């Protein structure tokens, strides 16, 4: 009886350690991928494409949406420690919120529909949520905060949603 309890406790600890190690490794991979950002043509300099969401999606699909959000957060912290910030933290907050808007819905749907179809539906849903949330956050919160932080004028009459 006591060996069953001991084995159960050991298995729980091993699973927790394995999850922490996986989160750390995926966050490190995402951070390295984030270093290779591609600027978008015809867009402001702070809009860039990076492939750092791929390992986060892998982690989200294998360990759940909470782990995906944790990987996203650690990636942002590591990138902040390596590169610092040129956006007074607004870009890092934007990256975290918009990244979570992609991976959390994808992870939640995949958790309910554990199949290739569920992964595809999750990624499509995550992309749609990320697009709408990104537009809203950029228009009403992030860009005004960025403009205020750098004392730049911003004409809010240009925003029509």
Task: Identify the function of each model-found stretch.
Residues 1-159:
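Loop-helix junctions at membrane interfaces
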């Amino acid at each position: 009886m006591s060996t069953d309890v001991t084995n159960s406790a050991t298995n729980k600890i091993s699973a927790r350690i394995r999850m922490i190690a996986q989160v750390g490794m995926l966050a490190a991979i995402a951070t390295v991928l984030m270093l290779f950002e591609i600027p978008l043509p015809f867009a402001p300099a702070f809009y860039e494409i990076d492939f750092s969401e791929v390992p986060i999606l892998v982690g989200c699909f294998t360990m759940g949406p909470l782990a995906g959000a944790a990987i996203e957060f650690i990636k942002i912290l590591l990138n902040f420690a390596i590169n610092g910030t040129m956006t007074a933290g607004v870009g890092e907050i934007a990256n975290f919120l918009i990244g979570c808007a992609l991976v959390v819905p994808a992870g939640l749907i995949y958790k309910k529909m554990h199949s290739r179809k569920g992964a595809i539906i999750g990624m499509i849903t995550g992309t749609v949520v990320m697009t709408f949330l990104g537009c809203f956050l950029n228009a009403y919160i992030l860009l005004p905060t960025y403009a205020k932080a750098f004392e730049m004028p911003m004409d809010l009459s240009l925003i029509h949603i």
